[in-house]
C-alpha cells in the first residue's frame, strides 16, 4: 500500500559523531558508557557551546540512525509543571479535561516500541523546579526502578518509565 511506506532514516555512527562534534574518542566512549549504564546524564557548559547539538547527535549515534521520531526535546522554565510534563487538568469550554504531558506521551510511545531506544532531552533543566515537575516519578527515572509501576497523581492509571528511555539534561 502506497500510504504505508516505511520511513528510512539515515545511518549515524560513532564515527559520524566524532566527525561532527569536537570530542575525543575516549571522551565519547566515557559519555556513552555513563548514559547507557545509568540511563540519565547531565551535560554541562556555558550557553551557546553546543550542548543541544551534542545531545541530539549523541542520541543518534547510540541509536545508529538519525531517527527524529525517537528523540524529543523540551525546555524547562520557572512555570513548567507536572501538568505539562506528566498530566494534569486543563481548562476547556465545558470545564476541565485531563491532558497528558510531553514525558508521559513520550514514555508511552517508547513502551510500545520497546525494541528501540528513545531519548528525551531536557534543555535548561536547572531552570525548572524538578520536584514539582517530576513529582512521584523522580524515583522511576533511576536505572534500577525502570519498569516499576507507580500510581499517577491525577489518574488511577499505573505508569512506568521503560528501560529503553534515556534522559539527557542540560
Where does each model-flagged region fall?
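AAA+ P-loop NTPase catalytic core and its hallmark functional loops
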Residues: 1-170
